[in-house]
Amino acid sequence: MKRMMVIASLLLAGGLAYVMWPAENQDRQTASMTTNVSSVMTDVILPEVLSENALIGKRAFEASCASCHGTNAAGQGGVAPPLIHKIYEPSHHGDESFQRASALGVRAHHWRFGDMPAVEGITRGEVTFIITYIRELQRANGIH
């Protein structure tokens, strides 16, 4: 009886560990579930006019972020999530969240794309402009 309890406990612990730390398998799982890896994940309504700072941010985004997060931050299936999404509204992911993610990387916690690495060679100032660009896109899409 004691032996069965030990075996059951080990199986339960192993199952919990698998559920709690799935990040290692996420990239493979997502890639196998995605037929068109570069597909746009959301339609983005563009604002009629971007501020000067947002235009600077757009250029920086295109150079440092778009290869993963897609054109106009629309995301790419199997690669990275859209930033024009309610999850990234300012009340949930404030501006400092973007600063920290770009500087330090971030562990996957909303999406199944795996962890985001730190962005090499980008300054805090450039990220500030990128945030301005993302926030203006978000507002044009009803995310406040």
Residue ranges of predicted features:
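Extracellular/periplasmic low-complexity linear segments
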Residues: 26-27, 92
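Sequence/structural segment immediately N-terminal to covalent heme-attachment motifs in c-type
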Residues: 50-74, 93, 97-104
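Histidine/glycine-enriched, metal-chelating micro-motifs
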Residues: 8, 75
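Activation segment of ePK-like protein kinases, specifically the conserved APE
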Residues: 73, 106, 138-142
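Extracytoplasmic electron-transfer domains, predominantly the class I c-type cytochrome c fold
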Residues: 84-137
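Short cysteine/histidine-rich zinc-coordinating motifs and their immediately flanking basic loops
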Residues: 77-82
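C-terminal capping alpha-helices of c-type cytochrome domains
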Residues: 2-5, 11, 15-24, 118-144
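Electrostatic cytochrome c docking/interface patches
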Residues: 29-60
